Amino acid sequence: MATVNQLVRKPRQKPDAKSNVAALQACPQRRGVCTRVYTTTPKKPNSALRKVCRVRLTNGFEVSSYIGGEGHNLQEHSVVLIRGGRVKDLPGVRYHTVRGTLDCAGVSSRKQARSKYGAKRPKS
C-alpha cells in the first residue's frame, strides 16, 4: 500500500474508459457504404429475422449496423449514416443506421416516435 507522501507526489491513476463505439472516432455519426445487406437471428430466448448491413465507413472501418423499423430500401452500395447504439440480442452489432438520411428512406406509415425513423408528419 502506498504511503500518504507517495500519494501526494503521484496520485492514483483512474483507468482510461474504453469506448463502445470505436469506429465513430469520437464523432456523433459516420457515413459509409453498404457492402452487404442481410438478415440474422438473435440470441436465445428471442426469435426473429433482424435486418443488418455491413458498412465500410469513410475512415476505413468495416462495421455491422442494425436497420431499425419495418421495411427498408437498402442494398449493396447504398450510402448510409450510422450512429452508435448496440442491439442487445445481436452479438457484434454495435451501431444503428440513421433512417431518413442519405440513401436510407424513412419508415412509411409511422405515426409515433417518427423522429427516430425519419418519418414525415402525416397530413391530418
From Swiss-Prot:
A GO CC term assigned to this protein in UniProt: small ribosomal subunit
Residues the record lists as 3-methylthioaspartic acid modifications: D89
Gene Ontology biological process terms from the UniProt entry: translation
Keyword Phosphoprotein found: no
Pfam families tied to this protein: Ribosom_S12_S23
Keywords in alphabetical order: Methylation, Ribonucleoprotein, Ribosomal protein, RNA-binding, rRNA-binding, tRNA-binding
InterPro entries hit by this protein: NA-bd_OB-fold, Ribosomal_uS12, Ribosomal_uS12_bac
Chain residue ranges for the region called Disordered: 1-22
One GO MF term attached to the UniProt entry: structural constituent of ribosome
HAMAP family noted in UniProt: Ribosomal_uS12_B
Record note on quaternary structure: Part of the 30S ribosomal subunit. Contacts proteins S8 and S17. May interact with IF1 in the 30S initiation complex.
Similarity-based family: Belongs to the universal ribosomal protein uS12 family.
PANTHER family assigned: 30S RIBOSOMAL PROTEIN S12 FAMILY MEMBER
Listed NCBIfam families: rpsL_bact
Function recorded in the entry: With S4 and S5 plays an important role in translational accuracy. Interacts with and stabilizes bases of the 16S rRNA that are involved in tRNA selection in the A site and with the mRNA backbone. Located at the interface of the 30S and 50S subunits, it traverses the body of the 30S subunit contacting proteins on the other side and probably holding the rRNA structure together. The combined cluster of proteins S8, S12 and S17 appears to hold together the shoulder and platform of the 30S subunit.
Protein name: Small ribosomal subunit protein uS12
Organism (species): Pseudoalteromonas atlantica (strain T6c / ATCC BAA-1087)
